[in-house]
Amino acid sequence: MRIADYSVTKAVLERHGFTFKKSFGQNFLTDTNILQKIVDTAEIDDQVNVIEIGPGIGALTEFLAERAAEVMAFEIDHRLVPILADTLRDFDNVTVVNEDILKVDLAQHIQNFKNPDLPIKVVANLPYYITTPILMHLIESGIPFSEFVVMMQKEVADRISAQPNTKAYGSLSIAVQYYMTAKVAFIVPRTVFVPAPNVDSAILKMVRRPVPAVAVEDENFFFKVSKASFTHRRKTLWNNLTGYFGKTEEVKDKLTKALDQAGLSPSVRGEALSLEEFASLADALKGQGL
């Protein structure tokens, strides 16, 4: 029997008198086939260390610990720590850290792996309410995670992996794809969770690029420009950029020159621009002193 078997999950929760906290976005997976598929998608073996976020009662952790060198699981809910000590008692390669992943010194924790030089993968069922902040925090942490295989709301997975000229494409797509390739591996129906969420989930596989997707003069400025370009999706690039940089004649003149230099029409919408075009635009705007 597995932790994720419905009868086991139910028994564990009852034994510990656990009640779900909506504020933590807790939904426990009760399908062992899907858990196996997640670990297979992540290609976990004994030459990999794993960071897990939100282990719950250890359903995914169990599958990870069977194959990984070590698993470090960050759980914000202190009530789950004794439950994890119970459900994962047979594993000596799991460390549970009762801290908020957004506030920990992750680089310091990683040094606590027995072999910190092994590749590190992030495998997790992320809380829906805070998926994007967690992902961006980890991606921008400077820690060279080789891969992320994470479950999230399907809509968010679609946005992250979206291509130009699609409804889902936006600044989040650019922010992630600048650092990583992103592809939806498979869909997870809402019916396999306790309690069931209101939406379906997706497993997103992201692999770190050896170097960023595009070369830019100023990364922060590149992200600001891409974000500004999607402020109002139905508006043109010109309208969004004048809304961000200002509408003085001087700004308009600089914008005109930058768009011309980047080979872009003022009437194009942000959703039509590739990462390469956003890079050209950001560098041209920077060159104009904006």
Swiss-Prot record:
Gene Ontology annotations for the cellular component aspect, listed alphabetically: cytosol
A molecular function (GO) term: 16S rRNA (adenine(1518)-N(6)/adenine(1519)-N(6))-dimethyltransferase activity
Reactions catalysed: adenosine(1518)/adenosine(1519) in 16S rRNA + 4 S-adenosyl-L-methionine = N(6)-dimethyladenosine(1518)/N(6)-dimethyladenosine(1519) in 16S rRNA + 4 S-adenosyl-L-homocysteine + 4 H(+)
Residues that coordinate or bind S-adenosyl-L-methionine: 27, 29, 54, 75, 100, 125
Keyword Signal tagged: no
InterPro entries attached to this UniProt entry: KsgA/Erm, rRNA_Ade_diMease-like_C, rRNA_Ade_Mease_Trfase_CS, rRNA_Ade_methylase_Trfase_N, rRNA_adenine_dimethylase, SAM-dependent_MTases_sf
EC assignment: 2.1.1.182
Subcellular location(s) per record: Cytoplasm
Any Pfam family matching the protein: RrnaAD
Keywords in alphabetical order: Cytoplasm, Methyltransferase, RNA-binding, rRNA processing, S-adenosyl-L-methionine, Transferase
Stored PANTHER family: DIMETHYLADENOSINE TRANSFERASE (PTHR11727), DIMETHYLADENOSINE TRANSFERASE-RELATED (PTHR11727:SF7)
Reported function: Specifically dimethylates two adjacent adenosines (A1518 and A1519) in the loop of a conserved hairpin near the 3'-end of 16S rRNA in the 30S particle. May play a critical role in biogenesis of 30S subunits.
Family: Belongs to the class I-like SAM-binding methyltransferase superfamily. rRNA adenine N(6)-methyltransferase family. RsmA subfamily.
Protein name as it appears in the record: Ribosomal RNA small subunit methyltransferase A
Organism: Streptococcus pneumoniae (strain P1031)
Lineage: Bacteria, Bacillati, Bacillota, Bacilli, Lactobacillales
Gene: rsmA
